[in-house]
Amino acid sequence: MKNITVILPIHDLKGEYNEMFSRAILSVEQFHDDVSLLLVGPKNVLGDLKKDSISDKLDVNIVINEGDTGFCSQVNLGIDNCETEWFSILEIDDEYTPNWIKSFRTYHTLFPDADILLPIVKDVNSEGKLLNFTNESVWAYGFSENQGELSNEILLDYQNYQTSGGFYKTEVIKENGSFKDNIKLTFSYEFLLRLTHNGAKVATIPQVGYRHVNFREDSLFWSYKNSDDHKLGDGEAKFWLETAKKEFFFKNKREVEYVDN
């Protein structure tokens, strides 16, 4: 029985996005015996798509989003509609590596109580050039009291952890809340802080399982750094970091607003 759902949020399928979508589907098809695919997006993008035209290998479900189509809201809607024991988040311009499932099976045996398992993420630029790796620090000698485990205490000091590509127990996330779409920049950081604060066990997999395109032009985090409409200054970036450290005590989002002094 397939017990993992891959949630793929989509806001556009024109031009280069269609090429990204095709690569993302091929990435998931490697694991067609183990996973199902859940697409989330607006009706004008996904409304005319036929399941059998997407993949002849995967079990595909489509959820039409009639509300906010921002990344957090799309993922949250996918989680609400997830019925498997586990889920993972795949960004449209990213890919899983061939050992993604195998390494999960191996390290879930090592960490049987884990509610979340995060693979090492290979960060590349839009040309595919290696930039760095993420999520690997927890295996450094002496970094964590329990090697391989990511605690709330560690997260309060270290913020750079990637949530896409990881494995999440659906029941635990539904119980503790998903992404808060009103938090800019640090929404995934607040998410991990909240989960670990509430007792969720997070372990990391010391193998590369996910390839992430970092700061692709027009991506959300690119816009925070470069867009005239969404660019964040140093003061606002610091504000959202501190906000994450205050808001993780609360399951539901509260009103938060940055005021430029």
Features from the language model and the residues they span:
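Acidic donor-binding loop at a coil-to-helix junction in glycosyltransferase catalytic cores
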Residues: 184-191
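Nucleotide-sugar-dependent glycosyltransferase catalytic core
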Residues: 69, 129-135, 182-184, 197-201, ...
